[in-house]
């Protein structure tokens, strides 16, 4: 299998899996949503490189490598927050963004009902959260 096709397939599977978990009730935190962005970009870049392999693949390969390394770093940071190695952003613990007016306060109070803290994993398998698995998979894919 061509590397760009394999990268596309793995990336699509990762995104389908996390959306499925969200569909069945595992609510992601804000950092979890941000961890999806490199995968979305990798899907686009690898899909384009399937059709224009000879023209852009050498450049695309390096950009995809950087996205996987960045994804691994971000996922490692998030996993460290979940394991309480360090603190996350202030919005991870409180669920409130910068409040500038009474209307902002009311919106934040209403949004807290669906708030998921970043320091608590909503799903663990074999002791690792999805951030931990994202770290491992991004690291492996960056080596690939």
What are these regions (language model features)?
Residues 18-27, 78-82:
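Juxtamembrane "helix-exit" motif on the non-cytosolic side of transmembrane helices
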Residues 31-41, 105-108, 112, 125-140:
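Membrane-interface loop-to-helix entry segments
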Residues 83-129:
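Extracytosolic (periplasmic/ER-lumenal) interhelical loops and adjacent juxtamembrane/interface segments
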């Amino acid at each position: 299998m061509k590397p760009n096709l394999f990268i596309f397939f793995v990336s699509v599977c990762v995104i389908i899996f996390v959306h499925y978990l969200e569909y069945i009730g595992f609510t992601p935190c804000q950092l979890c949503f941000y961890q999806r962005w490199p995968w979305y970009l990798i899907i686009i870049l690898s899909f384009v490189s399937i059709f224009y392999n000879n023209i852009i693949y050498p450049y695309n390969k390096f950009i995809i490598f950087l996205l996987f390394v960045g994804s691994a770093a971000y996922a490692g940071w998030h996993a460290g927050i979940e394991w309480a190695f360090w603190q996350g952003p202030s919005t991870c613990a409180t669920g409130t963004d910068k409040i500038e007016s009474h209307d902002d306060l009311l919106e934040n109070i209403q949004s807290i009902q669906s708030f998921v803290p970043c320091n608590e994993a909503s799903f663990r398998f074999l002791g690792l959260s999805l951030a931990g698995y994202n770290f491992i998979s991004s690291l492996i894919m960056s080596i690939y």
